[in-house]
């Protein structure tokens, strides 16, 4: 799908940072999930990546909303949800399972890092306040 994404942005998990939308990141995530499921030949993998990426872009296009500047903005979660939906819609259930599992592991890791940072900050504050 050839599309101009120059006014598409992704709001990062900090809910402040806007970065340019990059459909190649979607393709890479799909590719990683496919590779984790099985070792298929490169041409089949690339065809599947393109098909799924195109489906994700269609789903995103159906959910476009504009910010005050007239730019299209999606959250990371919205994009990931569309990837999951595209994988299931296209019948790639094992790939969807791998993608969802990886996504959940990353979420748990982020939560652990956040908890660890909070513990560290509390420790430092207690150390200097005593």
What are these regions, as identified by a protein language model?
Residues 1-130:
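Extended catalytic cores of very large enzyme megasubunits
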């Amino acid at each position: 799908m050839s599309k101009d994404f120059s006014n598409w942005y992704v709001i990062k998990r900090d809910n402040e940072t806007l970065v340019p939308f990059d459909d190649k990141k979607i393709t890479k995530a799909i590719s990683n999930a496919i590779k984790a499921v099985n070792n298929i030949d490169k041409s089949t993998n690339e065809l599947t990546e393109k098909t799924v990426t195109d489906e994700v872009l269609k789903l995103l296009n159906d959910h476009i909303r504009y910010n005050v500047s007239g730019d299209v903005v999606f959250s990371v979660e919205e994009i990931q949800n569309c990837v999951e939906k595209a994988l299931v819609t296209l019948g790639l259930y094992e790939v969807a399972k791998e993608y969802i599992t990886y996504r959940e592991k990353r979420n748990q890791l982020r939560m652990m890092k956040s908890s660890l940072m909070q513990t560290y900050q509390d420790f430092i504050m207690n150390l200097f306040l005593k």
